[in-house]
């Protein structure tokens, strides 16, 4: 396996990531992420091509993650991203100390792509555009701390709220999304209407639409996903009014976008609709600098003192390497 092939490990084709992995119940973030992290760490360590290949080969035996918790419960998915990072560092260190991995770990008969994707794996697509078509500009910054499939519904609900819709006036809500999205945010319906915890609320279309209509944070914030918030009678009453359905326009855009449409019926019989075609946070609908700064701040102060969070946010204005070093060496202090 060549080094250019390795460098594409974290950047599998979008359709492959969002379709094949999820249909099999696999969490691509924690599986592909382990391999990508191993490559990045090995490169930062200055390992040669063989060492980087071994790091990827080792990580491919470590990466794991199932999506059943999205449907029926459990909070294990919260550790998936951290586990991928852990695997990447461990794999690179093991390779640096002499452990080896199979050189055809990605494309081999019993390799990564065949094991996880079967006949739908297309290794050629992984290297298409290598060196000319960069994925980084297409990175999406999530504005809300909930499943990405819920975001367009959140924004549609926020749009209706901004137009003056009062939650107390709502008698029925229809949330239209792409058909493949329903299994994540709408099924089983009873569990999505009454999430078992704040964590499970983050994967509920009905709950996130209700939270958006009630307002808060950037629209929906961490405070909306506590266990107490998930038990809030106002939120649950509003979520119970939400019916999730397939919308053909949304299905036509999937998986290149995760659009949604929210249709509301009011007590007076008025019917309102808001459709969001392009998710916020990506190149087609980016967050403003102020929104990104606010997101960083709101997350950072959950672990760092306010002063240190502010200093970190001001990092682009650092006058010297010493300023950066001082900030990094004190990052673990509270």
Where in this protein do the model-derived segments appear?
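Glycine-rich, mobile lid/loop segments that gate access to catalytic sites or pores
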Residues: 1-90, 102-109
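Terminal-appendage/accessory-domain detector
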Residues: 69, 76-86, 93-334
């Amino acid at each position: 396996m060549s080094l250019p092939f390795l460098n594409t490990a974290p950047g599998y084709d979008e359709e492959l990531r969002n379709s094949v992995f999820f249909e099999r119940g696999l969490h691509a973030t924690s599986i592909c992420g382990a391999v990508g992290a191993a490559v990045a760490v090995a490169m930062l360590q200055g390992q040669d091509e063989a060492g980087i290949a071994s790091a990827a080969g080792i990580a491919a035996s470590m990466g794991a993650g199932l999506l059943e918790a999205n449907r029926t419960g459990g909070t294990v998915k919260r550790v998936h991203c951290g586990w991928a990072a852990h695997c990447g560092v461990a794999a690179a260190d093991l390779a640096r100390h002499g452990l080896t991995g199979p050189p055809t770990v990605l494309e081999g008969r019993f390799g990564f792509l065949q094991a996880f994707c079967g006949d739908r794996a297309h290794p050629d697509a992984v290297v298409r555009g290598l060196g000319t078509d960069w994925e980084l500009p297409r990175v999406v910054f999530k504005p809300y701390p909930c499943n990405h499939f819920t975001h367009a519904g959140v924004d549609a609900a926020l749009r209706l709220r901004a137009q003056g819709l009062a939650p107390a006036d709502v008698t029925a809500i229809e949330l239209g999304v792409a058909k493949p999205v329903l299994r994540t945010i709408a099924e089983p319906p009873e569990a999505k209407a009454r999430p078992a915890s704040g964590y499970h609320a983050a994967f509920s279309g009905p709950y996130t639409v209700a939270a958006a209509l009630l307002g808060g944070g950037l629209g929906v914030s961490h405070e909306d996903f506590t266990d107490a918030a998930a038990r809030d009678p106002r939120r649950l009453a509003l979520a119970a009014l939400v019916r999730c359905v397939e919308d053909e326009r949304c299905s036509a855009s999937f998986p290149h976008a995760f659009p949604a449409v929210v249709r509301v019926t009011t007590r007076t019989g008025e019917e309102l609709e808001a459709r969001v075609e392009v998710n916020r946070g990506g190149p087609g609908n980016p967050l403003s600098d102020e929104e990104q700064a606010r997101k960083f701040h709101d997350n950072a102060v959950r672990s760092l003192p306010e002063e240190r969070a502010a200093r970190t946010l001001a990092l682009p204005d650092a006058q010297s390497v010493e300023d950066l070093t001082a900030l990094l060496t004190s990052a673990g202090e509270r």
